[in-house]
Structures are given as structure tokens and as C-alpha cells.
Regions:
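A short, proline-enriched helix->beta-strand linker immediately N-terminal to the Walker B motif
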Residues: 109-116
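Conserved ABC ATPase signature
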Residues: 91-98
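Catalytic "switch" loops of ABC-type ATPases
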Residues: 41-52, 154
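Conserved catalytic loops of ABC-family nucleotide-binding domains
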Residues: 37, 130-158
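Glycine-rich P-loop/Walker A and Walker A-like loops and their local beta1-loop-alpha1 context
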Residues: 2-37
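Q-loop/switch helix immediately C-terminal to the Walker
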Residues: 47-82, 91
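Walker B catalytic motif
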Residues: 91, 117-126
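Hydrophobic anchor residue at the start of the ABC signature
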Residues: 105
Length: 170
């Protein structure tokens, strides 16, 4: 049994605090666990979102989302996450890290992925974006019953009032 086998089981808004090296190791273990797992309710949110080269951004965001789901929830979710409609018309290389994260969160809501594992995006975000992200993540937990595991090295994030649980990575 690996030391981090329970990492894909978490509740509320949980922060896993550790160095970047520890995060990389844990993130690799989580990916490996998910590949061998039958869980379909988990999504990994990455700052360097891997895109399918043959899809445009809108197709990427709505991949595997039914038309019914898309039509019934898209506008409401875009509004909640403060995603401008012009964002979906951008080229992938025009997106900043915060836009990529918000689009992945929108996909997670539409795809009904209720467990999110988020790779540390903090170094690539402004203070305002970090504050907005924490509010969005807390809203996902409270409004959509999501469970979120955020890997970070930033102690101020771990001590945020939005965070329910904090664990040391080691």
C-alpha cells in the first residue's frame, strides 16, 4: 500500500500543503491511482490544461457534455464563475491560467464531476485571481456538494477561512 493511497478520498474543501517536489510526487501517485480506479466522479484541474489538438476551445470545454446539459446549465454556470462569453471564442494559447482553471471548473460542473483535484496554480495567479478562485471553490463545495483537494505550497491558502481541512503532504 502506498503512503498516499487515500488521497482520492477527501471531503469539503481540503488543502494538501507541501513543497513543490512533494506535490509532484503526490500528483503522480493520484494520476496513477485514478488510471487504475473505476471512479468516474473525479476530475483533475491543471494549470497547464492538456488540450486535444484537433478541438477548438469550445469543443474542449463541452467534450462529453450532452446538448441538454449544456443548454440547461451553461449560462448560469458561466455567470457564477464569471466567465465572459468571449472567452470561449479565444484560441487556447490566448488563455491565461485563471481562465483555463475556470473553464475546467465549468466542465466539471456540466460533467457532474463532484470530486476535484487541483494542481497548485497559485504562483501563476494574481492576488485578486487567488481570492476569486477561493470563492469559486468554496461555492462549488456549498452549492454543488463538490469535494475539492487543492495541492499547494502556500501556507496562506491553507489558512484561508474558505478551507475546511488542511493536511501536511509529508
Amino acid at each position: 500500500m502506498k503512503p498516499h493511497d487515500s488521497l482520492i478520498s477527501f471531503n469539503g474543501f481540503t488543502v494538501l500543503l507541501g513543497s513543490k517536489a512533494e506535490q509532484q510526487l503526490i500528483f503522480s501517485e493520484i494520476k496513477e491511482q485514478l488510471l487504475t480506479s473505476e471512479r468516474t466522479d473525479v476530475m483533475i484541474v491543471q494549470k497547464n490544461w492538456p488540450f486535444f489538438p484537433y478541438l477548438n476551445l469550445k469543443e474542449q470545454v463541452f467534450l462529453d457534455i450532452s446538448e441538454k446539459q449544456k443548454k440547461s446549465k451553461q449560462e448560469d454556470i458561466q455567470s457564477k464563475l464569471m466567465i465572459d462569453s468571449s472567452c470561449l471564442k479565444k484560441a487556447v494559447d490566448e488563455l491565461n491560467t485563471f481562465e483555463k482553471i475556470k473553464l475546467q471548473l465549468m466542465h466539471a460542473i456540466l460533467a457532474e464531476k463532484t470530486n476535484l483535484i487541483i494542481e497548485d496554480p497559485i504562483d501563476d495567479l494574481s492576488i485578486t485571481e487567488i481570492q476569486d478562485l477561493l470563492v469559486h471553490l468554496c461555492d462549488l463545495v456549498n452549492e454543488f456538494s463538490f469535494s475539492i483537494l487543492l495541492l499547494t505550497h502556500d501556507l496562506s491558502i491553507a489558512e484561508s477561512p474558505y478551507v475546511h481541512f488542511c493536511k501536511e503532504a509529508s
